[in-house]
From Swiss-Prot:
SMART domains: IG, IGc2, IGv, KU, TSP1. Residues 706-715, 879-891, 1002-1012 have a biased composition (Basic and acidic residues). Pfam families: ADAMTS_CR_3 (PF19236), ADAMTS_spacer1 (PF05986), I-set (PF07679), Ig_3 (PF13927), Kunitz_BPTI (PF00014), Papilin_u7 (PF16626), PLAC (PF08686), TSP1_ADAMTS (PF19030). Residues 900-990, 1039-1128, 1133-1218 form the Ig-like C2-type domain. Residues 1-20 form the signal peptide. It comes from the Eukaryota. Residues 1231-1270 form the PLAC domain. This is Papilin. One of its GO terms (cellular component) is basement membrane. Belongs to the papilin family.
Length: 1280
């Protein structure tokens, strides 16, 4: 019994302690609130928070404080400035350019995710979204256009008073805490069902509407569309359905909601408002309309707004960061219709442009690669490399190099090397040799050589190495041919008679062709005579045959007319051909003049080739090729029968004669010191004349004239001539087998050197010299050669230059390459006239009397011919064409003259000078021999040229249009040429007394060809010429030039009634021509027809009666020229033949006619505002404007518009195309055994319900169901 009181007392003593501990546990208290944190946003409503500590006595680490430890409040609730980026979009943009599964995207906000406060973003152009963060930054709106915001990952309510968790809300009129009395509702249901397929207008929401809500009554295949009253679609326009999204429209945010593809759900549109412009709501109808409910609110007691400004939504920002701009349309409206802007001019006009996205751009790192180098080999497997480096981009286009370590974290550094040209190399394949070309003697045999690829198929010869190409031909030796008696002796032509009268002697060559003379004696007893008497008539009678004293003849033998004149010097200098001279007693006053220099007004005379008479008619055969049996293998002896009968055997030549060969390599000398050989031209101190026969002399060098320097290339006489290097022989007429093709922009055939061919039928032809852009003459042997061969200069220029070929640097232009020491060589190595190669013209010299032109003065007897000045070297040294037969030391010094001539300024240490006047155009050529690919680096005063008035031409020259004084300075070019200094040209812009003739438009007004001045452009000035300008000094008389009209101007001009038109007419010549315009032979003169100072005719207010032909007539007192211009007055455009509506059965062809009255009209078709592209299969558009659509389908229905355009005129007409569906069959057709449903793979009922039979993937599982039910095709979808 005593135990219970003890226990009771212990309980009483322990209870107060336990109670005290419980009291202390519950007395955990909050400390004071801390400071408010910075606001999470700078505008638009951010969140700031503060925290307080809990003081607790608990030992387990927990607390017993009741209430939140953090308090939030809104801050910076004022609206953000215009153009600031969406806050959620800024957070998504932080991941732009970062690696995401091996790719880099631009991220946009995605609002349709279930959790509104997660940072879900969607890549631009993709159809998936990704959660980048679990929570957005505090203060981010939960949905666009709404006031609720996210705080700590939870969507919190914000009242209209901008306070967190406030219950104060806006009414439908957007009044905070209002009762809705300041506006009135507009509600209704659009349930019309007689709608056409396509877009149908439902209603118009006026400007100023608030609390807009539009929703389908039930799910359907129809779509809601929104556009402005100007016809600009904001949503689902042009048959393109967009995904659910928030759209900035009419200064509010329009929230568009619909199900994804295959998920039928009613469509819904919501917007807070107020709208800044009327919005047109349409229904894109595809099936019956279940009804569309709509509700919006308008301000109450609106007295009628009258005319007022409306504006559209702001467009996209021009830059994603770093500061851009955006614009919007501002227009005047009343009663939901647009009116001209001046109707609203009494009200302030809203701004239409603002800045946007001013935040700095983030820097991103990425790898950048350079171009691949050429492959190390052309076949068989090689390697090529490229540079790969790390760069940093700032988002505005700026880039800078970065350390590779900064890109080390990026996935997949691009490779720096790769294999290339892995295909097997092509090889030469040879066929067996063919038969020999002869049955006896020596001939040739051929075989076929083909380049074949790795599979044995033939490929182009360029794929094989040309140096390894097997030979195509080789000699073959058959049995010796029988020798006939008449073929043993080779008899040459008679030489000139030793006397012209009184019995002279002449000789000829008689050679045994089969070996020693004894063999010929065995076959033929009598040897033909080698010498006979000649000219035995008395001296008062004419000579019977040509003699040394008078080589003229009436003989038709072409070999009697001229002969080679060879200098017997031992250094192998070239032969020179010239006309035979008359005896001094019969010489004309021009005797002694250089035969290669032309008289004024004539082109330079060609020098004759070897073995060739002057180019004049002759009745006799020209060479052995005209003999009945052709030529012998030596190329000059006529064959006496087939199989080279009577031809000399190999080795039986003049080399076996007693005194050896003459310098021509064919004729045998008749005595020592080349006695009996024909001399080269040029006179000597013994009185022998050119063309005379030589006699033995103790001083053989007496008759040696100066020959031209330079060795003739052996390739020139090959079958196809020389390659571009003038050393190697070409393998074909287009330079096959040649390397190092020049980089001139001319056809390939025009880049080759001249080729004389392998025959001797000499004729003058023309070839193109690409280095100067002109044509030159050369001797052609009559067969083979290459394709750079033309019958006339006009054909040559038209083929190689055409009307718009690369511009030829004019003579005198800086940088023109002067070929001074030698021109193109003719047959036998003779020089062709240098002035043709350089593109210059030998000018006429002015007479002392001051007349503009006269023929050149005759040189005094014994004096060398006078040579006009050809050009100046820097420092005054003059450059002239070489005079054949005249030694360099014997050249006379030509005194300076004021004659108008072309001069060539060679590149030197001083800059070339170009002068021009303001307003003109000037073309600068790079001085020196610089290829065009190195001329592109033009600079002025050491800085790159960037003005749009500077245009770089294809030939590397620079054109400066509309010259200004500030364009003067030092221009340099060729700076990209490795190892060379840039060339400089000084441009001086002056308005002094120098008359400048610009060549600013060379392609539109080509240089003339004056037949009186050779083949160069007309002389228009004197003095130094450079840079494409020709400067005429007023201190010297200007020469007369031929009148010509610019015929490159349009010959047909179209105009519309009421227009002002100009008919151009440009003329050049001196004296300056006057221009007049005529029509029907009468002068054109009226207040509407005015002739301008530049010669053009201006017609004001063109009328239909002004159409017709006009002639421009130019006259300068000496010449007269005219050209015709047709003026066509175009009538108004009209369209006929297109009915308002067309109904075509399904599967048939729709033929839509569009007949347009008018000329030069372009016709375009469109469907529902989108252009129609003809595919050549189902859709065709003929030139007359007819549109054909085969196999018409229901989806082809719509509004088709034919638009006709001509200049600024346009007209259009539309028609509605309806498709008549066939009547349903009474019984279902047999679908066949293969067309069945596959229920184990797809739910066909759902596919039919979702109307996905038009999808190839889904319909493949439900063939039978989709065949029985073919829904109409749906519009194009765009997801994301």
């Amino acid at each position: 019994m005593q135990l219970f009181p003890l226990l009771f007392s212990l309980l009483l003593t322990s209870t107060p302690g336990s109670w005290a501990r419980n009291v202390r546990r519950q007395s955990d208290t909050w400390g004071t609130w801390g400071e408010w944190s910075p606001c999470s946003r700078t505008c638009g409503g951010g969140i700031s928070f503060r925290e307080r500590p809990c003081y607790s006595q608990r030992r387990d680490g927990g607390t017993s404080c009741v209430g939140p430890a953090r308090s939030h409040r809104t801050c910076h609730t004022e609206s953000c400035p215009d153009g600031v980026r969406d806050f959620r979009a800024e957070q998504c943009a932080e991941f732009d350019g970062t690696d995401f599964q091996g790719r880099r995207y631009r991220w946009l906000p995605y609002y349709a995710a279930p959790n509104k406060c997660e940072l879900n973003c969607i890549p631009k152009g993709q159809n998936f979204y990704y959660k980048h963060k679990d929570a957005v930054v505090d203060g981010t709106p939960c949905e666009p256009g709404q006031r609720d915001i996210c705080v700590d990952g939870v969507c919190r309510v914000v009242g209209c008073d901008h306070k967190l968790d406030s219950i104060k809300q806006e009414d439908k009129c957007l009044q905070c805490g209002g009762d809705g009395s300041s506006c009135y509702p507009v509600t209704g249901t659009f349930d019309g069902n007689d709608l056409s397929r396509g877009y149908n207008q439902i209603f118009i929401i006026p400007a100023g509407a608030t609390s807009i809500r539009i929703e389908e009554a039930a799910a359907s295949r129809n779509f809601l569309a929104v556009k402005s009253i100007r016809g600009e679609y904001y949503l689902n326009g042009h048959w393109t359905i967009e995904a659910a999204q928030a759209l900035p429209v009419a200064s509010t945010v329009l929230q568009y909601e619909r199900g994804v593809e295959g998920d039928l759900a009613p469509e819904r549109l919501q917007a807070r408002g107020p709208t800044s412009e009327p919005l047109v709501i349409e229904l894109l109808s595809q099936e019956s309309n279940p009804g569309v409910h709509y509700e919006y609110y308008l301000p109450a007691n609106d007295p009628g707004r009258g005319f007022s400004w409306s504006h559209g939504s702001w467009g996209d920002c021009s830059a994603e960061c770093g500061g851009g701009h955006q614009s919007r349309l501002v227009f005047c409206t009343i009663d939901n219709e647009a009116y001209p802007d001046h109707m609203c001019q009494h009200q302030p006009r809203p701004t239409h442009r603002r800045s946007c996205n001013t935040q700095p751009c983030p820097k991103t790192k990425r790898w950048k690669v350079g171009p691949w180098t050429p492959c190390s080999v052309s076949c068989g497997g090689g390697v090529q490399s490229r540079s790969v480096y790390c760069i940093s981009s700032d988002g505005t286009g700026g880039q800078e190099a970065a350390e590779e370590t900064q890109c080390a974290g990026l996935v997949g550094k691009p490779p720096t090397t790769q294999a290339c040209n892995l295909q097997h190399c092509a090889v030469w394949s040879v066929e067996p040799w063919g038969e020999c070309s002869v049955t006896c003697g020596t001939g040739i045999r051929k075989r076929s050589v083909t380049c074949r690829g790795d599979e044995g198929s033939p490929v182009h010869a360029a794929a094989c190495l040309l140096k390894d190409q097997p030979t195509l031909t080789e000699p073959c030796v058959q049995e010796a041919c029988p020798v006939f008696r008449g073929q043993a002796w080779h008899v040459g032509s008679w030489s000139l008679c030793s006397k012209s009268c009184g019995s002279g002697i002449r000789r000829r060559q008689v050679v045994c062709t089969i070996g020693p003379p004894g063999r010929c004696v065995d076959l033929q007893s009598s040897k033909p005579a080698e010498m006979e008497a000649c000219n035995r008539q008395p001296c008062h009678l004419p000579q019977e045959v040509p003699s040394i004293q008078d080589p003229r003849t009436r003989s038709s033998d072409p070999r009697m007319l001229s002969g080679p004149r060879v200098s017997p010097v031992s250094d192998g200098r070239e032969q020179q051909w010239a006309p035979l001279e008359r005896p001094r007693a019969q010489s004309n006053p021009r005797e002694g003049q250089d035969p290669n220099l032309s008289s004024a007004g004539r082109a330079p005379t060609l020098q004759r080739p070897p073995h060739q008479p002057p180019l004049r008619p002759s009745s006799g055969p020209r060479d052995c090729r005209h003999s009945p049996h052709g030529c012998c293998p030596d190329g000059h002896t006529p064959s006496l029968g087939p199989q080279w009968q009577g031809c000399p055997l190999a080795g039986a030549s003049c080399l076996q004669s007693r005194y050896g060969c003459c310098p021509d390599g064919v004729s045998a000398a008749e005595g020592p010191q080349q006695a009996g050989c024909t001399r080269s031209h040029g006179s000597d101190n013994t009185g022998n004349r050119p063309g005379s026969r030589a006699v033995a002399s103790k001083n053989p060098k007496i008759h040696q004239p100066q020959a031209h320097e330079g060795e003739p290339s052996e390739c020139r006489s090959s079958r196809f001539g020389c390659c571009y290097d003038n050393v190697a022989s070409a393998a074909g007429p287009l330079g096959e087998g040649c390397v190092g093709q020049p980089s001139y922009a001319y056809p390939v055939r025009c880049l080759l050197p001249s080729a004389q061919g392998s025959c001797g039928d000499w004729a003058a032809r023309w070839y193109f010299v690409a280095s100067v852009g002109r044509c030159n003459r050369f001797w052609y042997g009559g067969c083979h050669g290459n394709a750079n061969n033309f019958a006339s200069e006009q054909e040559c220029m038209n083929t190689c230059r055409g009307q718009h070929g690369p511009r030829r640097p004019e003579a005198g232009a800086a940088g023109h390459r002067a070929h001074v020491d030698g021109g193109q060589r003719g047959p036998g190595g003779q020089q062709e006239p240098d002035w043709h190669r350089a593109g210059a013209t030998i000018p006429r010299l002015p007479s002392p009397s001051g007349s503009p032109w006269r023929r050149e003065q005759e040189p005094a007897p014994g004096e060398p011919p006078h040579i006009p000045a050809y050009g100046n070297r820097p420092g005054g040294q003059e450059i002239r064409p070489r005079v054949p037969g005249l030694d360099r030391e014997a050249r006379p010094a030509v005194p300076p003259t004021h004659s108008p001539s072309y001069r060539i300024r060679l590149a030197g240490s001083e800059p070339s000078l170009v002068q021009a006047a303001p307003g003109q155009a000037v073309q600068l050529f790079c001085p020196g021999n610089i290829p065009s690919e190195f001329q592109a680096g033009w600079q002025k005063e050491g800085r790159p040229i960037s003005s749009n008035r500077y245009q770089l031409q294809a030939d590397g020259s620079l054109i400066i249009s509309r010259l200004r004084p500030e364009d003067a300075g030092i221009y340099s070019c060729g700076s990209h040429r490795p190892g060379h200094e840039p060339q400089e040209i000084q441009l001086r812009v002056t308005g002094g007394d120098m008359a400048v003739f610009p060549e600013g438009q060379p392609r539109h007004f080509p240089e003339p060809r004056n037949p009186d001045l050779g083949h160069g452009p007309p002389h228009r000035g004197t003095g130094a010429e450079a840079g494409g300008h020709r400067v005429l000094s007023p201190s010297h008389p200007r020469p007369a030039t031929r009148l010509r009209l610019d015929r490159t101007q349009p010959g047909v001009v179209d105009a519309s009634p009421g227009q002002r038109i100009r008919l151009t007419c440009r003329a050049e010549g001196f004296p300056v021509p006057t221009i007049e315009w005529q029509r029907d032979g009468q002068l054109v003169s009226s207040p509407r027809h005015q002739v301008q100072p530049d010669g053009s005719l201006v017609i004001s207010r063109v009328d239909v009666e002004d159409g017709g032909y006009y002639s421009c007539v130019a006259f300068n007192g000496q010449d007269r020229d005219q050209r015709w211009v047709q003026l066509r007055v175009l009538r108004e455009l009209t369209i006929t033949g297109l009915p308002p509506a067309v109904t075509v059965a399904e599967g048939d062809t729709a033929r839509l006619l569009c007949v347009v009255a008018g000329e030069s009209v372009n016709i375009r078709w469109s469907r529902n505002g989108l252009p129609i592209q003809a595919d050549g299969h189902r859709v065709h558009q003929s030139p007359d404007g007819t549109l054909l659509i085969h196999n018409l389908r229901p989806r082809d229905e719509g509004s088709y518009t034919c638009s006709a355009f001509r200049g600024s005129q346009a007209v259009s007409r539309s028609t509605e195309v309806k498709v008549a569906l066939p009547a349903p069959a009474a019984q279902s057709r047999d679908l066949g055994k293969d067309c069945i449903d596959q229920p184990e793979l797809a739910n066909c009922a759902l596919i039919l319900q979702a109307q996905l039979c038009g999808n190839e993937y889904y319909s493949s599982f439900c063939c039978a169901s989709c065949s029985r039910f073919q829904p109409n095709a749906q519009p194009v979808w765009q997801q994301g």
